[in-house]
Each structure stands twice: as C-alpha cells, then as structure tokens.
C-alpha cells in the first residue's frame, strides 16, 4: 500500500492535498472526529493532526474540486443546508471544512440511510441529520436557520425546482448554491449538456447568477456541478 509523503494546502480553506510515494495525489480534510473513518477512507496522522483521504469517486464535491472548481463557498464557520445527505460521505467532509464554528444540516428521505447518517453525526457536533422530504421544506423550517450555502444532490427530475424552493426558505441573500445535476435522472432522451443548460436557465430565471458549470467525468458520468450565487428572494 502506498505511503503518505506530504500534505499541503490547496487554494481552498481546510481542503488539503495528500501526496503518496507511488506518485498519486488525493484530496484530504482534517478529521473533526479523530479515529473515526466514515466510508472506509484512510486516516493519516501528521504532526499530531489526523487527516482523512477524500475519495472524489465517492463525492461530487471532491470531484468538482479536482475538475477545476473556481470558488468553494464552504469554509470555516459556514452554515450549510445539504439536501440528499445520504449516509453522510460528503457531509462528513463538509463537516471537517466548516469546523465547530459552522453547521451542516443534512436532509435525507430514506429512514434506512438516515440511520447510517446518524452514526456519522454522533461523532460530529456540527452535523445535524434531518429525516424529511426535500420537496416540503416547510416541515423542517423550524429546525434549520438561514444558511450561507445550499448544497443539493438529489437524483430527481424536479431537482432544480426543489432546490429553488428550499433557497426561498433558507438561503441568505448573497448566499451560494452548489447543485449536482444527474442528467439521466432528468431526461434520458436528451444529451447531458442540453439538460445542464436547461437547468441553469431555470436558476437564472429565479434570481441566481450562475458562476460555473463543471462536468464531473470521470468521477461521475453524466453529472455536472453548478455553482451559483443567490441574488435574493
């Protein structure tokens, strides 16, 4: 197995680069819950600090960073609403990035998956699992404060509409949305690039300035990450 030889900072706060003796380079984050691995990722201790390897093939945010994300609005102290938290793989890295000064509210619809997410959250005081349907934000509005970033990863045909609706409830004016679009969940008959353009236009029509659209191949086939800034309700 390859051994870690160097950890260095990236352009993004609290996102690091791990270099190994076989020449490979991976992303990593400081582990907010030392000793605990979330999805089988490797842990490394350097000068008393534990880091977690961040597998971009398991995380669309990790893939977007490696594919040239220009700006990561998720930093120390950020409050994030995460729709489609699943079992907590990417939310756990977001939890590392925002540290204890930030908060990550993770909405997931599947009770079975939420049980796994709860096991992750019990070691992370800044991670708040919510069992709910993201189509109905009014049911969790009392649980979530206004947030700086809305992160959306729900493989539904109406994902963009759900994202916009949640933004109206929770996203601060001037806040950011990061949305992972799965083209095949929206329309299997159209080319992915055509679908990305359609969904981006919906955002523009609903008070978002679209900053960047990143195709996530090879990390996620027929997926794109959209970064947009919210101009307000």
UniProtKB/Swiss-Prot annotation:
GO terms assigned for molecular function: histone H2AQ104 methyltransferase activity; RNA binding; rRNA methyltransferase activity
Residues that coordinate or bind S-adenosyl-L-methionine: 89-90, 108-109, 133-134, 153-156
Domain of life, source organism: Archaea
UniProt entry tagged with the keyword Isomerase: no
Keywords noted in UniProt: Methyltransferase, RNA-binding, rRNA processing, Transferase, tRNA processing
Coiled-coil segments: none
Enzyme Commission (EC) number: 2.1.1.-
Keyword Transferase attached: yes
Top-level EC class as recorded in UniProt: transferase
GO BP field: box C/D sno(s)RNA 3'-end processing; tRNA processing
Family: Belongs to the methyltransferase superfamily. Fibrillarin family.
Function: Involved in pre-rRNA and tRNA processing. Utilizes the methyl donor S-adenosyl-L-methionine to catalyze the site-specific 2'-hydroxyl methylation of ribose moieties in rRNA and tRNA. Site specificity is provided by a guide RNA that base pairs with the substrate. Methylation occurs at a characteristic distance from the sequence involved in base pairing with the guide RNA.
HAMAP family: RNA_methyltransf_FlpA
Record-given protein name: Fibrillarin-like rRNA/tRNA 2'-O-methyltransferase
Recorded name of the encoding gene: flpA
């Amino acid at each position: 197995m390859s051994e870690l030889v160097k950890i260095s900072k990236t352009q993004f706060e609290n996102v690091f680069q791990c270099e190994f003796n076989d020449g490979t380079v991976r992303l990593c984050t400081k582990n907010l819950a030392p000793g605990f691995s979330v999805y089988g990722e490797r842990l490394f201790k350097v000068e008393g600090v534990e880091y977690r390897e961040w597998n971009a093939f398991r995380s669309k945010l990790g893939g977007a960073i490696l594919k040239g994300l220009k700006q990561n609005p998720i930093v120390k102290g950020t409050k994030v609403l995460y729709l489609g938290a699943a079992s907590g793989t990417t939310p756990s890295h977001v939890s590392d990035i925002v540290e204890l000064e930030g908060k990550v509210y993770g909405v997931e619809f599947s009770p079975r998956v939420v049980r796994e997410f709860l096991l992750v959250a019990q070691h992370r005081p800044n991670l708040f699992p919510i069992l709910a349907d993201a189509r109905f934000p009014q049911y969790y509005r009392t649980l979530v404060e206004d947030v700086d970033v809305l992160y959306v990863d729900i493989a539904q045909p109406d994902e963009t509409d759900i994202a916009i609706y949640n933004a109206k409830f929770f996203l601060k004016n001037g806040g950011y949305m990061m949305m992972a679009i799965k083209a095949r969940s929206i329309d299997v008959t159209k080319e992915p690039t055509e679908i990305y353009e359609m969904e981006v236009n919906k955002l523009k029509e609903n008070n978002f300035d679209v900053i960047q659209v990143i195709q996530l191949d090879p990390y996620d086939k027929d997926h794109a990450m959209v970064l947009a800034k919210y101009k307000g309700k």
